[in-house]
Amino acid sequence: MHSLRPTVPASTPPLDLLLTGADILTAEPGAPLIRAGAIGIAAGRIAFIGAEVPPGVTAARTLDLTGRLITPGYINIHLHSALTMVRGVAADLGFAPSYTRGIPNAMDLSAEEATSLARLGALEAMLSGSTLIGEHFVHADAALPALAELGLRVHTSLRLHDVDFAAVANGAWNYEAEIGFSLLEANLELYENWHGKEGGRVAIQFAAHAADTCSPAFLRRIAMEAKARGARVNTHLAQSKTEIKRVRQETGKTPVQVFDEAGLLDDHLLCGHCLYIDETDLPRFAASGAHVVHIPKCNAASGRMAPVHKLKDAGMNLTLATDTQHGDMIELLRWALATGRVQEGGVSDRWQPRDVFAMATINGAKALGLEHELGSLAPGKQADLVVLDCRRAHLTPATDPLGNLVHTAQGRDVEMVVVDGRIVVEDGHATLVDEQAIIADAQRVAQGLWKRARAQA
């Protein structure tokens, strides 16, 4: 555990930013809440954190944050930001847009349209406290510069598959090697051009879409390329009964078995949903070190819940993500807590606010191999943090700030977001981009997409 004692000597040069007066949840294992504490930031990192400011410390900018709560930035590890285009509609259709006729889907998007919508979704996520997003979708290469401009961390990939998605919504499942080859080549180019750029805020992953949309041969190729670069692989695993049925028909195996045989089932695999993990696969799944990406709101909206207690009891690392159509990780804390308790049929010590808070912070960092840099607030770590304004009726009294955060806070309570020591949200608004221009452009694009989709239905 990192020490939280202020140890900065008086001779230290001025800090870039000094935050005082706020309650602080560090997400460090076993660390207590710091009441009315202080955080010093210099050169993008946390210089000190504690109950008081060390003597002699000065800063280029000092902010009195009395009445606020500071937490680590939220690691939103699985996100398709462009799917803001089906907000308010797709959740009531029962299945993902790519599999559904009559609504806009990925294959309908131009690079410009995907960029506009992805920028909106990423903006929403950042305004709600996400400091890192795991973004994978079509035209990710075109959208990446616009997402990086927001100032948050972007771990991204093109959506990799060799099924012909243009035919999937009509019930045809055709695998074409050329589709997969073209997408993978584009993602390799994206990796070469962008991985590690923007001061390390950008990382390129390999997003193998799913076991039913990637042939076993294509999954093996993805595994080879990702392993050669030490890259993370983001996927949807056991997300639907249709997936389970199709994979069984095509291979005679389960999705977990298919990923294992392809060489993907290891500690670099980020597994979204995990709704239908076969009981016989659980020991193999847990032993692999793969990470579970829990997506409680989207799952519950379709009437389903992941077996999080079985996965946790098996020793798996559980992370959290918004997935599609909304980007509020604070709201998601509540969904994760509540749906987990519905599954248990009550309240127990094994599923408490501290558990879902860890999923949104340090567990996400662990899944990315970045737990020594991100996911908690400690001296030496990168300065990614969120400030919530708790001087509000629904956050009063602040008897237990963690309990309030999980049970009653909202993304709109976020007052400030700091990424790599830089303020990217202040007074609830983005500092580096024109919010209203992003919103207006996305509205324009979405209206055009819906008009086209309805004409084709």
Model-identified regions with their sequence ranges:
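Metal-coordinating catalytic core of metallo-dependent amide/deamination hydrolases
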Residues: P145-L275
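Active-site gating loops and adjacent loop-to-helix segments of metal-dependent hydrolytic enzymes
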Residues: M85-S116, L158-G180, K241-H268, H291, ...
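Hydrophobic faces of well-ordered beta-strands that scaffold small-molecule active sites
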Residues: G73-I77, I133-E135, V154-T156, I204-A208, ...
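His/Asp/Glu-enriched, well-ordered alpha-helical/loop segment
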Residues: E261-H268, H309-R392, T408-A409
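Alpha-helical scaffold segments that flank or form the walls of functional sites
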Residues: R87-L152, L183-G199, A442-V445, R454
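Active-site glycine- and acidic-residue-rich loops that bind
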Residues: G134-F137, Q205-R221, A300-S302, A367-G369
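Active-site microenvironment of metallo-dependent hydrolases
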Residues: M1-G37, A42, A47, T361-A457
